[in-house]
Amino acid sequence: MATEVRAQLAERSLPSPKGELKLEKKSGCQPRSHGDSGPQKELMIPGIVDFKLIREAVRTSKPQTPSAYRFGRLSHHSFFSRHHPQPQHVTHIQDLTGKPVCVVRDELSLPTISVPVGDPQSNRDPRLYSEAWKKELKDLASRVAIFTKESELKSKEKEEPQREQGAKYSAETGRLIPASTWAMARRHSHQGRNQPASRDEGDQTFVLQDQELLILELLSQILQTDSLNAIQFWLLYAPAKEKDMALGLLQTAVAQLLPQPLVPIPAEKLLNQLLEVQDSLQERHQLPYSQSPKKMKTPPLSKSEKPENIGKAQVLRVHSSQNPEEKAAKAEG
């Protein structure tokens, strides 16, 4: 019993925290005097840590010093970096008299552009774009030219066996050339064409330029545009299938523009024409030396001019109509 009584007395003697809180609240509710203008600190409960108050205390800014900026911090603009003293860019050197002279290193004050504006590759080589589309156009023109040459060679190979059976007619000389001599002449002409390759290089460049212009014009018709930029963009970025389709159209168009091969003439018809030409040439050569048959008509001969038949021979007496006196005068003279 004694121990229980002592425990109860000890509990009554200790002040309860609830009672203290009530007293603190009552004291906080009392009206403030007009003289207390300073901020009142909040009462802290022992054993309890308020993290919100700690964060707010950390966030509170330090009191500004007199050297702080009046209207906030200055920006990093080149004007402020130039007109605000900076020890990194401002130094002092001595002049001839030994006095310090202020020197400003403003190379780093202004912003510099290290990378060119726009596409760096186009700025490094401005002709890159033009050379690229010209190369594509040249490749397209060469493919079309190769196709046309192959088609011409195939057509010639088909025609040559039929023509080489008979003789060839030369329009320059107007004569027939045998097949053997024609083949030899063709071989010599092919060898001569292969040898002067350096002379034909200039002509080939002109031909290639003409082909490129022709293909450029045909492309404008195929793509249905008059804009050179659109054609350049198509040459650079068009897919392979689309280019193949355009190549087929270009090949057919160029094949139609090329002159068609001559139709071969049959051998019999050619010989008849040659005979007619030769006859007409012979008549033209004979006309100056001999008169035509219409002009050959002469008046009938007189009896004195007609030849006399003596046996099987015909004898013509010359000057038979002259008098004997005239004959004697001629003899004396």
Swiss-Prot record:
GO terms for biological process: cell differentiation; spermatogenesis. Residues 1-42, 284-333 are annotated as: Disordered. Residues 324-333 have a biased composition (Basic and acidic residues). Pfam families: SPATIAL. It is found in: Cytoplasm, Cytosol. InterPro entries: TBATA-like (IPR037394). The keyword Ribosomal protein does not apply. It comes from the Eukaryota. Its main location: cytoplasm. Signal peptide: none annotated. GO terms for cellular component: cytosol. Coiled coil: none annotated. Keywords: Cytoplasm, Developmental protein, Differentiation, Spermatogenesis. Belongs to the TBATA family. May play a role in spermatid differentiation. Modulates thymic stromal cell proliferation and thymus function. PANTHER family: PROTEIN TBATA, THYMUS, BRAIN AND TESTES-ASSOCIATED. This is Protein TBATA. It comes from Bos taurus. The gene is TBATA.
